[in-house]
Amino acid sequence: MRIGIDCRYVRIGRHDGISRFTAGVVTNLPDRHDFVLLVNDERQLASLPDGMPWELIPAPTDAGEPLVARHVNRLGLDAVFSPMQTMGSRGRDYALVLTLHDLIYYRNRTPPREFSWPLRLGWRAFHLAWWPQRMLLNGADGVVTVSATTAGLIAAHRLTKRPVTVAYNAADPAAVRSPADGRSRTLVYMGSFMPYKNVETLVAALPLLGADWTLHCMSRVTEADRARLSALAGPGAVVFHDGASDEEYLDALRSATALVTASYDEGFGIPLVEAMGVGTPVAVSDIPIFREIGGDVAEYFDPASPSAVAAAVRRVESRWDQASAASIERAGRFRWSDSAEQVVQAVERAVEARG
């Protein structure tokens, strides 16, 4: 079978979530089919495996995206998998599997900052009702999502009549921490500073833990957010890395007591998988997606309560060696090879269903 993989969401430079998901799946595809990478810029190939066949098609932001099948039909593909749900399906002569990662933007409608104002306006309008999503998903032959939590929400909101397959998000393999790395009284937070991320509660928990605890915030931060959060904490209690490199982030994880997040809502939670994968326990808000990822290995807390955050960190500290070992085992559930296999099986079922 000849299968196209839509790689047009691969970022040039550093990955974001969709870009990393695409690259993780592509790098681990099983070898029982012929795969063709579909890109809109040759520079995207630098983030993808060498030597794979590829074709150039228009960008997903092109006005003609609803009719992109006109270009794809010429490639002689049996099927296409896209890591997004917005790939045009009209007029296609191949099986199509789309991806809906999560429904978080129906609850938190702020669009990505890098979008132009027309795209931001369209983004908000799209997420005001369910019918546009249903129209997109029902235009495919199958749908992939990255968690059982989101699969349940897709069913609850009756977003598609098509079969839904779970292909978990995962983290790239990284070296496990060693005793030589030590363990400091530091907590790591990886994520944005949007209101629903609730970073303020993490900061408010620091004085309850003690003056020797620090919170390391790894992502880029605006001056306004830096000033606001610094004012809530004592001097030096919060360290802003303002866009740490992957290696700097992993180094911080390997010496920390725990990764923490107090989000009220999340689409997934890749930082949890990244932390557990190197043997760093996690203490996180008690929401369904984090329960799915952390199982009985993570510590959970009420995200509205700084004292609950502090108590969860203390519980991690009291059983740290056991929590570290269990975290590594738990992270093994989230592997790109398994995700790629699930994607390909979804494509195979879609081709079979079309006859």
Annotated model-derived regions:
Residues M1-G355:
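Carbohydrate transferase catalytic cores enriched for Leloir-type hexosyltransferases
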